[in-house]
Amino acid sequence: QVLEKIDQDIMQGISVSKILEVMNHRIAVLYDREHTIGHAYFASLIEEPSVKKLAEIFKNSIIPLLQEYFYEDYEKIQLVLGDNAKSDNQYKFIVDRKLNVSEIFKGHIDVDIAEKDYKIQSQAFSLAQSYIEIYR
């Protein structure tokens, strides 16, 4: 019922209940059912139903929680957030870029190094579409 109240009040077409349902399903598939996100994280939206408040919740609670769950495996975090299928890069909470490892280290190296670099994209948190595209 908390989420129904929030869904009625929050503007710009964002469904917090759908966000939670889809993200929790993805977490259950990628990790387990014991580590899903509770609706209590979103309770403050009842008093202040706004994208600004939702952004605060994601930046300060949801993203750090996902970083902890997935040991900063940003590829999995991107999957939970739907960033792999967003219509435009501006809606991605986490963006990646390919690293040219041989260029960085000048030649062949025998060390296992990630070939992508990840960055949290602050401006995505203020865009309603970033949240809508988690579940669409």
What are the residue ranges of the model-derived segments?
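C-terminal regulatory/interaction module of P-loop NTP-utilizing enzymes
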Residues: 1-136
